[in-house]
């Protein structure tokens, strides 16, 4: 298996040590709880629709349990995570909360003793056979598993409007960064209002998301992963070159000062006023929820420079230490990890299932394409969505990007130094 990859295979032997002698902390009991509170940042659009499908199943299976949806709006959880931290510090943890697989789960929560060990639940539900072995590793610390993946998202997606592209003389998706810049010039000459759609609101996470993609596209996956292993320097020539690409991309937007959230900004694609948009595949679910049609109002391709690369993230659910309605939470986790639950949730959420046995006939053409790429592409974790970075680094990255944009997107060296300082602080 190639470095950094997570394949759609079930390798039970890889997880065997974690299962052997596992904790009994997640031993199931009948759900006699009268309430259940879930905490996410899925408050609108396709995200809320996906959550709603899962909630409907839960209510049908647990009719005596009142469902409490404690969603906090804000893309990538920029608002929700702050609220969650305050609640957990005050001893008021929700019964289950959303967290990204990778360092977000492992370093931000599990290593802090905030989550229950779910290894026994994995054994009882057979998830060691139905989830990819390497994905399970992304929720595992010291042999114990701490969250349940409900999906896989792709971060490095290029979106555009076919009719707008045709008017600009663009007949195929750009595959390289140079080709993308050539097409941006075509959009500009054709009078497209915003050749490069930018989303600068919601705590700058969407601009950090764009930077994360640019780093992979410019440097390649090995150099990118080296930023977190220490083999690539944040202040070295590779990052310097990537930041020139980033700076140039921003020049095709609203001078890097767009204050729209990702949903409002992305509407420029389906309305035909925007050229290209780099955003995760939750955008497709959002647009479909708004009535747009895939293939007519928008289409997709891997981000230029990342053809054959799948920059991934995974939403998972947890069992916090001290959850008031523990049995109700266990019922939610079992549903979230089930085939029925994942195939109800993901087609509406705009993601593919984390399970290996998903029924792809329920998914649209984009998601079928994503599933095929997930099975064969070089996989690279998302920084902006918690795979390669914990909450502390993500917050620092958002702040560094916000500072860069507010300064006119001119201080590339300063941005590199801020990112290096953020990584150094995490390592310490």
Per-segment meaning from a language model:
Residues 184, 228-258:
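Glycine-centered hinge/linker elements that transmit conformational signals in sensory
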């Amino acid at each position: 298996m190639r470095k950094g990859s997570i394949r759609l295979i079930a390798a039970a032997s890889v997880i065997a040590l974690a299962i052997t002698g596992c904790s009994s902390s997640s031993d199931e009991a009948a759900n006699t709880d009268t309430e259940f509170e879930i905490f996410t940042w899925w408050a609108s659009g396709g995200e809320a629709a996906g959550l709603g499908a899962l909630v409907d199943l839960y209510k049908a299976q647990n009719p005596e349990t009142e469902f409490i949806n404690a969603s906090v709006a804000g893309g990538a959880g920029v608002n929700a995570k702050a609220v969650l931290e305050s609640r957990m510090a005050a001893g008021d943890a929700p019964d289950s909360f959303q967290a990204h697989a990778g360092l977000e789960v492992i370093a931000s929560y599990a290593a802090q003793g905030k989550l229950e060990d779910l290894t026994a639940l994995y054994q009882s539900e057979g998830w060691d056979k139905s989830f990819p072995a390497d994905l399970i590793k992304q929720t595992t610390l010291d042999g114990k598993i701490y969250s349940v993946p409900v999906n896989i998202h792709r971060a490095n997606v290029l979106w555009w409007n076919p009719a707008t592209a045709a008017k600009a003389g663009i007949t195929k998706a750009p595959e390289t960064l140079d080709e993308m810049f050539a097409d941006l010039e075509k959009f500009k000459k054709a009078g497209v209002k915003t050749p490069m759609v930018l989303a600068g609101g919601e705590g700058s996470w969407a601009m950090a998301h764009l930077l994360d993609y640019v780093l992979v596209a410019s440097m390649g996956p090995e150099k990118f992963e080296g930023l977190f292993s220490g083999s690539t320097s944040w202040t070295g020539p590779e990052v310097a070159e990537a930041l020139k690409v980033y700076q140039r991309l921003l020049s095709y937007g609203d001078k890097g000062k767009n204050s729209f959230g990702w949903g409002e900004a992305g509407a420029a694609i389906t309305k035909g006023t925007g050229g290209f948009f780099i955003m995760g595949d939750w955008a497709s679910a959002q647009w479909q929820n708004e009535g747009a049609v895939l293939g007519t109002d928008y289409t997709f391709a891997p981000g230029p420079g990342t053809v054959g690369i799948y920059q991934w993230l995974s939403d998972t659910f947890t069992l916090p230490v001290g959850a008031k309605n523990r049995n109700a939470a266990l019922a939610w986790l079992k549903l979230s990890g089930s085939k029925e639950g994942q195939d109800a949730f993901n087609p509406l959420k705009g993601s593919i299932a984390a399970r290996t046995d998903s029924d792809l006939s329920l998914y649209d053409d984009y998601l079928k394409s994503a599933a095929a790429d997930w099975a064969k592409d070089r996989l690279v974790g998302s920084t902006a969505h918690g795979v390669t970075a914990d909450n502390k680094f993500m917050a620092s990255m958002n702040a560094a990007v916000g500072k860069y944009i507010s300064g006119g997107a001119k201080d590339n060296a300063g941005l590199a130094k801020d990112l290096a300082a953020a990584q150094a602080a995490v390592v310490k």
